[in-house]
């Protein structure tokens, strides 16, 4: 998670990386996460052999990373650190209970990472090791808690690499070895530039910087264009299209790399220039300080190049208005409260695309306005209810990205769909927290039976039945069971198989076990109640066959109709847990009276939960992700402060009384011995006493733990409503336009023992083999005396840090999906016409129309995703109010034309509200409207495209749509498997496993499931029957209205820069159309487009112009000349023709050969417009490395992307008198239709006749040298031509600038530092009112 490389921000960096590894270990879903080093509740394999486990008892003194109640919470202070012994402060005292002697022995435990980080902070404070500004801020503050930044996903660098660089091709025969005309001081500034652009450079190109786009991207620049071979793998396309796929793959990989560029620039090594050691030219460009890595820019050639004409050109450009070049410090920003520098601007030699992204990153960080209060709210959401915090507001000195609630919840939903085992990771974090609270721990003394239990056969059978269900106390399983209660569920859970025949009265143990489980864990009970019904029905069939028959006759399942009425199936059917998410319910829990089944109904009422719904108030305050507009968590029980009797204990007494009667009635019916009834009743009374003893621990302590965990960041779904009869979890899916979807909750998901396979027997050790701090305080524990054990308040930094790490890892894991979704979805548009209705209408004014074909292929699929109604069918009688109602209901400004002539008011509404009218076709449009002001003028219309994002009220993304649409037009059609391959290939460069916690998370998440085609993916609810529901703003959260491609605002801003980069002609280098013309070319110019000679006849190619005919006893291709109709069977002697080929489809090889022969023998000029190609300029010393002939171009299949080489012969060496004569002329056939040397910066860096400019030599553009300015809103601007004017934003034009202002952080900004605060724990756990907190 931490990628900071700034040395000044490395405090605790090692501890930060170690923390997740120590606290996040996974153990096959068994709840071990976070319990080895950080928690108090972990036990050794020998747990249960002593009266209390070592780690469990140890928590009474001080748990790892936790603190005691009240004022004792101040572990270490900045002010007292000067006197305290830090080594002693790190020690923790713990106690162990002995089986026979309640004695105390001391044991030393190592501090946890959280504690260590706090100690390190205080030690640094005491030793004057903290940054001076930080020391002032924290002076006098008691520090006992630290939390990592809420968002720390930046890589800090001091020497930024650009996206673009210069590449040079040299002609060695022109090289000179003249000494650089610069002093040693000047050489440090201008040397790299002069050495690169040296005399004899044939061509200087602007290329991608391979140092930034490293080998992991797979980008190959050997042909001068970016190619990636293994990203888009086309299938079912014509041979030859591979190059096109590789080209588009290269664009995509560049785009992704830019979108994920998370670098922040810190001030590195700088120099203050000494003016008397530098030349005047260098002095004039340097500021008060400059970055030591100056970089390369043509402006630095001024006065230092041996090429006279180039020096003069550069000098002239730098002296003209509108070009200002400089290096070094341009601006400084201060924290005016503490009077220290925070941000500085440096002019660097770096391209404006990279500079823009670097500035965007820093601006996003510095303008997030995250305050200490925001951070404290996050800590409070992970702290025991009523915990208070005090911390300074460090402001701009410790900036953080704002926590993007909407983006995080979308990523969590997508990750849950892709990785069902995400549930286990969240449960692990919650399990670690439960363990650290020391709320419960096992003891070796087992209290399953009363000491004076009767010794007879009935008692023996009872003991056997209990022992068959009650296993040895496993504290990890207990912690896991508690954690599951508030954790999200992404897999259907199942009941662990129970083998019970219910033939003996002692089998009532299983029924009691289920009832206890429903009391302790009502949420988890609800998840497996169907499986439990299967067991209970077997019990009822054995014990109450008559009532069972009545119940089965009504049906074992039911559904709830639209009116809220229960409709029973009338069938005897075994419950299948795959039905848990369906519309069916297990009938035993219907709570509907049933005449003749009174005993069954009475027993089933014992399963009624008695907890309450609590709003996740602290999570809401912390802006944590939640999947509901009303985020609530069901708490199994509430604290009982101020009550005379404990309601939880009273409830169990009712259960005991009911079951005692049930056993008694059964015994009477079967004429059982009195001993059977007596021992069962004795056992139940014993359990009642046990329950009385522990009830206060559950209601007054564990309830607070539950309420605390309900606010944790990753517990983002509502768990249970409290009503077994009606509750179904809200089900969300990731949809695609083709109608398929991927559910968030899997009906047939992962099966993990302890996580999704639920063992209800866990209730027995909880009841009979565990102790609790409040129980020990009351004197009812195994100690038999009151032990004032301290309540443990875990450090919230542990779970918050783990949650933040998981959220950021998941965001990275889903980023490749989001990126491909954006590319396949962004830029969707529908072709439309705007019919003008007024004489003076502008192009975009009038009534918008499209056709049904466009509607069905583009708009209707989106309506299908959201399941909204079809737009209204309008007729001549339609009113504006009816149209407005349809637009409001569908959220789409579209209507469907049906018939009639649309009246004036309706026409006016359509025009003024820009409603899109879907027509059968465009024939006779004017006759279908009566416009109030004027008739549509002569069918005047303007053709354009309407963005789908605009139709669906997502206009904030239109800025990227045009570029994305152009990119998509280049892509082949991809199947779901191909899309999945592309996502997986991109995922290889996301660096998710760059930290130990990331590696652990990946390992735990397991296999990725991606059956869904990520295109126009949205998050939608579904009904239990699987029907996808449209977005409902009364139910669904705002984040689900539209997925925003699953990208956050910062990623989208970078993406916009990346799109401009790959669309820039100097980078894209993709061209259309070539001219075939037979010419001699002794001095080749790659950009030369030969003119059409006078007298040539323009002809449009058509198949009918070329036919087969018999001539001179041979079949020949005959050309028919359109102006005269004369046939020419021979390519020789044909009229001079300028043939334009718009579409080559269907052209045979014979015709192509004939046309080329006409070019050679009759001097035809042929323009082929539908060819696409990339171009590479070759120098004389390179020569051609590949050859594409004209015939291949004419007969190639559609979709093939050619790579054509063009020679630049400007620096071809002059032949000497001793060179042999040429054997023939240089003939050339293929020419571009537009200049192709777009990547060129300079050409022919040599002197002609030692002084003059060679013909065709090119100097760099002044834009490459213009530093310009950085605007207040963060835009890089070119220098204005005139004073008072605003400069042109550099991103809005196709020029490329290699001198730009980059904003940098000073060492005063501490982005990687933890935030240190003082935590004040509640004084009394029993005084916390979790209902009103």
Swiss-Prot record:
Residues 1-93 are annotated as: Disordered. The gene is S1. It comes from Lymantria dispar cypovirus 1 (isolate Rao). This is Inner capsid protein VP1. Residues 1-10, 64-82 have a biased composition (Polar residues). Homodecamer; each decamer is made up of two conformers of VP2, called VP2A and VP2B. 12 homodecamers assemble to form an icosahedral capsid. It comes from the Viruses. Inner capsid protein that self-assembles to form an icosahedral capsid with a T=2 symmetry, which consists of 120 copies of VP2, with channels at each of its five-fold vertices. This capsid constitutes the innermost concentric layer of the viral mature particle. Keywords: Capsid protein, Inner capsid protein, T=2 icosahedral capsid protein, Virion. GO terms for cellular component: T=2 icosahedral viral capsid; viral inner capsid. Belongs to the turreted BTV-fold inner capsid family. Residues 11-20 have a biased composition (Basic and acidic residues). It is found in: Virion. Its main location: virion.
